[in-house]
Amino acid sequence: MPRILVAISADIYVRNYLRTDALSSLQKQYDLDIIADKSLALANEVSQDPSFAGFFSLAPDTERKHHLLFNLLMWRHRKKSRTFLYRWLRNSQWHLIKRQGPLLERALSVVSWIVKASRNPHGLRIPVLASAPLFPLVSGLLRRSLPVNPDLEKFVTTNHYDMIVFPSAAFDSVSVDLSRLGRQRNVPTLCLIDNWDNLTSKTVFWKKPDFIGVWGEQARQQAMSVHGFSAEQIHLLGTPRFDSYFAARDAPEEERHYEFPYVLFVGSAMPFDEIGTLHALERILESDPSVPANLRIVYRPHPWQQKRNSPAVFDSRDFSRVDLDLQIKAAFDAGLEPEKTDPAFQPELGYYPSLLRDAEVVIGPLTTMLFESALCLRPVIALSYFDGYHPNTGRRYFVHFEGMERVPGFTFCNRASDLHGQLRSALDQETIRAEVSDTQTSYFLFQDHLSYPERLAQVSASVLKSEKRATRTSKP
């Protein structure tokens, strides 16, 4: 029986690949070993998996060098994706420059940003070190100073694996080192791209895996144009997170989370004035006589908010028709804080289908939850205007959203003044037919008659078969 190594390098992969049944078909058909970063907040949970084979460690100094190289490559290749530039603007805290207020106050914010960006390891030093004169020298020195992780090397060299699989956001040292080890040991590597924007928002691979599993056709094109993969290296897999949305379409309706009709407002990890927008939405509901009197707003802030210029703390006492999402409220009651990231909190995916399905309309800044809402056949309003605080969250930087306007019921709100009219239209939206919606969303997310575990097993079999064929043909 072929032996496969699966490496888990982030807590979110514990939720997306271990808590789901993503690996179930592999576990039935192959001898599977799962290893994980021992510093994970959910490391103990991983160790309880029947396929668990051990932990590996990541040296902080080495990780910093990897991340510096990733950021230099991001800047160097920024013309390949507008989101690369956005990432640098965000990392350098560009949004902290004030665009409103007295001139002196705005000028001082610029000076303050320059000082902070000079000290920030992700700030001004990135474009300097990635400049044409310095990049070849600096990147070469960094690559030579990055040996393969010894723990990963030990796992790969002592266990004679037939294949190595790893989920990745395309911005981690583990994927680089496993790709290098695979080449050294003649073991095929399969990288599972985890999220929608990963191929256009992080960096470019400086050591590519042999094969890559992506969400859909859009990501396939990005893998070729941004990262230089060949068509033969790319497999359309989808994501294990979303199988439940398609299953929920035909399943009996579950008990509703809320007894009242609601507009769902989903927050973004990226900075956006969500509290101000909630006030605006509440005023719209209260001033429009055509809106049902019992229609409320459920606010689901992103659990891993980044620092923002606008108020971020939701206080129910400031609203009359807005309720905090129950799952997030429970997390806040347990200690989760706005504008902070707690990797141990990984929201249960089973909560999402009914939350999205039961919403009258879903509204929010540009976040993957809007795409998930479209999969649940809900009308969606994507807020793509300048919110008055954060100038770099506009639609022009989020290339993965290109084409979403073709999805039935999905609209972009490019001006705050249009929100009322678009909400009115969304509330009057005719029922969205699954077959019509799927025709458009399938460009972003591959869909067929198989589940994600079945597709992953099918792709793995194809990779193993092609590797055996290549080995036979290479023999004298």
Residue ranges and their predicted role:
Residues 268-271, 336-338, 408-476:
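C-terminal amphipathic helix plus adjacent low-complexity
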Residues 5, 96, 102, 153-172, ...:
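Short N-terminal targeting/anchoring amphipathic segment
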Residues 53-54, 124, 135-150, 167-173, ...:
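Active-site-proximal region of nucleotide-activated glycan assembly enzymes
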Residues 15-24, 242-342, 413:
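Conserved catalytic-core segment of nucleotide-activated headgroup transferases in glycan assembly
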Residues 1-12, 37-38, 58-61, 72-81, ...:
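Nucleotide-activated donor-dependent transferases that construct or modify glycoconjugates
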Residues 33-152, 313, 331-334:
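Conserved N-terminal ligand/cofactor-binding loop architecture of enzyme catalytic domains
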Residues 206-209, 231, 368-445:
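Catalytic binding pocket for nucleotide-activated donors in carbohydrate/polymer assembly enzymes
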